[in-house]
Amino acid sequence: MKIVILGSGAVGGYYGARLARVGQQVTFVARGAHLAAIRERGLTIRSPLGDFVARAAAEERTDGIGPADVVIVAVKAYDNATALPMIAPLLGTSTTVLTLQNGVDSAVEVASIAGEQRTLGGTTYIATALESPGVIVQTGTHRRIVFGEVFGELPRLSDRVRQLQMVMQEADIQADAVQDGRVPIWEKFVFLAALAGFAGASRLPIGPLWADEVTRARFMDACREIEAVARAEGVPVAADVVDRIPAYVEGIPGSMRASLLIDLSQGKRIEVEALQGSVVRRGRRAGVPTPIMETLYAVLRPHAGGSGRAGAS
């Protein structure tokens, strides 16, 4: 299967490496020193599951790759304006495009280029970091992707979703195919958008946030705001989507920092528009109040473009 990884950083690079390792025809789309390292030495994965080096094609542009069977989109959401047009040269009559981006806006944005009929939506649970150009380090063993159809008649489990699930499982990826891809995306978003907002606003990892009873209560209220937006949009998230969050948090190391907080502390751009901003805009359209998320959005929005310097806060 010809698979193109659009965004070959910590997440996309990891999954692409696993697919390449079992013989899939993978092309990484990357830039700069990371691109050069992949071309020269391959992509190194360091993991508790075992270290390995994946060797595959790597390109900066997509116009010479040709039609792909599958395109996996894993760029940061703030890069969509420049990255998503790179999908167009990869499209053939049977191309499938799977987005694994954070947030709930991605599938529509991808479909504006690829078409709804080609677009799948999904989310991933994994802890990886780009340690240096060409080197990705995994913490823990989670490597789960949950995905499915997000357009057309739902729920349904299509043949292409089943086929892609099998390809991923053969690469030792924990792939779950679902009948409505919107559900896992929103269920993760309920927690992620709130966590990223509180972590970014407080500059704290999850442990101190959760330990403070006032902060914890407002955090849960923020999750309920996001859940209300999901239901207003007709997404059938689980009835206990918020109630099960405390048990989930108890299993997370207290030192865990949201990726938005990491980016913020390094002076990088942050995904505030795709996370907190999306909740606010969708809530307004649906007539759902989101006062906590609106406050977090207002606090973080000035940092959207980053400061360009490490240690910024």
Which sequence ranges carry the predicted segments?
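Short, well-ordered alpha-helices that flank and scaffold nucleotide-derived cofactor binding pockets
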Residues: 17, 21, 85-89, 112, ...
